[in-house]
Amino acid sequence: MAINAQEISALIKQQIENFKPNFDVTETGVVTYIGDGIARAHGLENVMSGELLNFENGSYGMAQNLESTDVGIIILGDFTDIREGDTIRRTGKIMEVPVGESLIGRVVDPLGRPVDGLGEIHTDKTRPVEAPAPGVMQRKSVSEPLQTGLKAIDALVPIGRGQRELIIGDRQTGKTTIAIDTILNQKDQDMICIYVAIGQKESTVRTQVETLRQYGALDYTIVVTASASQPSPLLFLAPYAGVAMAEEFMYQGKHVLIVYDDLSKQAVAYRELLLLLRRPPGREAFPGDVFYLHSRLLERSAKVSDELGGGSITALPFIETQAGDISAYIATNVISITDGQIFLGDGLFNAGIRPAIDAGSSVSRVGGSAQIKAMKKVAGTLRIDLASYRELEAFTKFGSDLDAATQAKLNRGRRTVEVLKQPVHKPLPVEKQVTILYALTHGFLDTVPVDDIVRFEEEFHAFFDAQHPEILETIRDTKDLPEEAVLDAAITEFLNQSSFQ
């Protein structure tokens, strides 16, 4: 076979023209310092703020400080295997977490990895932990109620879907109990719940998960946990991971309740990280952008417009106070960001008034527009009556003689306090709340001894369930009260049959 030099040269020329170099170009740097959950690296010239970086041992970090000579990195996970001189690579991506239906019923860490021992989570969807909040024109007004099942909240400080309502109080005043009871009350309410535990003891988180499982609430709940034993970067990231998971459902038109327990510990973790990264400290040694830390998180909770699906994220952030000081730095920051706050007093808690809600210091700025008509009618004057009772109660300590009208107000106030008490993990449907509050505000309980109020309420609800379910059904379906004569007749019938007359 004759070799044609012309053909060979044409073939070589064609191969050269069609050659496409396939280089894997990755910008790398060198770790110059490692310790306390942070690292410094030199050589990453074009790294972005918040970019995910890959260490030689397979661990990941997130670029936090971009300086002229090096980059400050927070390490996501264990840093014991990382050494000075190790190579670090850019990934070109920002931090993302897995999202979707497959996370429901699972307990995960802030990176979306399962920690409940139930195997891998199979999902191919991810969302960035840092995402812009919905814009002004992408939002709708809060108009649908979120029923907590707690009389004191649904009557005095109602919460709407898409609202941010701060729960603030000292440690051991029942903050977590309110959140767990609210999650339990979302059963059959077409609501997905996300409980973010930040800096909690692992035994405490285990207890909360078992409570949710016992009452069947884990069927619609995701638990994101960054326990006290984990590195600070995970505590800092946990709330952002939780809200990223929530956004996936919100933009599908679903309603989500997210609980941050608690943001005080996130702020402390953030302060620790940025002091280690040598950011200049401000008030109480917190970095200057600690307000932005929480505002960019809580602004992602909203009720979005119908064009975006009409879904919502309702946020219940917690802040722990010291000796009831709600004027502390982080507390005032979060109060100014949220749409209201529920203040829990340790004095009330120790006096046996649980939930220990201080009606005078608690407010819901937008929840009133979401409250159902029936509750508005029966609870309209309840807050004023309660405040008036507290004021009069203070005067009675002087031992002065009281006129009949003042005595009647005190009697009604004592019964109001008793009615608003509620046992743990027993949320009450809104129609039952309305009937007992109607009986209270219309004077049907004025002759019932204060010590018998709890027994009265139990028998009252049992009577309505058995004898007048149609009244409860009317309230549930129409969101309004039936005719007063019908309710009055039913309550009078109960009193005639009971031992309370």
UniProtKB/Swiss-Prot annotation:
Listed InterPro entries: ATP_synth_asu-like_sf, ATP_synth_asu_C, ATP_synth_asu_C_sf, ATP_synth_F1_a_nt-bd_dom, ATP_synth_F1_asu, ATPase_F1/V1/A1_a/bsu_N, ATPase_F1/V1/A1_a/bsu_N_sf, ATPase_F1/V1/A1_a/bsu_nucl-bd
NCBIfam families listed in its UniProt record: atpA, PRK13343.1
Subunit structure: F-type ATPases have 2 components, CF(1) - the catalytic core - and CF(0) - the membrane proton channel. CF(1) has five subunits: alpha(3), beta(3), gamma(1), delta(1), epsilon(1). CF(0) has three main subunits: a(1), b(2) and c(9-12). The alpha and beta chains form an alternating ring which encloses part of the gamma chain. CF(1) is attached to CF(0) by a central stalk formed by the gamma and epsilon chains, while a peripheral stalk is formed by the delta and b chains.
Keyword check for Translocase: yes
Name under which the protein is recorded: ATP synthase subunit alpha
Enzyme Commission no: 7.1.2.2
Keywords: ATP synthesis, ATP-binding, Cell membrane, CF(1), Hydrogen ion transport, Ion transport, Membrane, Nucleotide-binding, Translocase, Transport
ATP-binding listed as a keyword: yes
Protein's membrane topology: Peripheral membrane protein
Family classification: Belongs to the ATPase alpha/beta chains family.
Cellular location(s): Cell membrane
A molecular function GO annotation: ATP binding
UniProt catalytic activity: ATP + H2O + 4 H(+)(in) = ADP + phosphate + 5 H(+)(out)
CDD domains in the record: ATP-synt_F1_alpha_C, ATP-synt_F1_alpha_N, F1-ATPase_alpha_CD
Function: Produces ATP from ADP in the presence of a proton gradient across the membrane. The alpha chain is a regulatory subunit.
The organism of origin for this protein: Streptococcus pneumoniae serotype 2 (strain D39 / NCTC 7466)
Record's GO cellular component terms: plasma membrane; proton-transporting ATP synthase complex
Superkingdom to which the source organism belongs: Bacteria
Gene name per UniProt: atpA
SUPFAM superfamilies cross-referenced by the UniProt entry: C-terminal domain of alpha and beta subunits of F1 ATP synthase, N-terminal domain of alpha and beta subunits of F1 ATP synthase, P-loop containing nucleoside triphosphate hydrolases
Residues the entry annotates as binding ATP: G169, D170, R171, Q172, T173, G174, K175, T176
Top-rank EC class of the record's enzyme: translocase
Major localisation: membrane
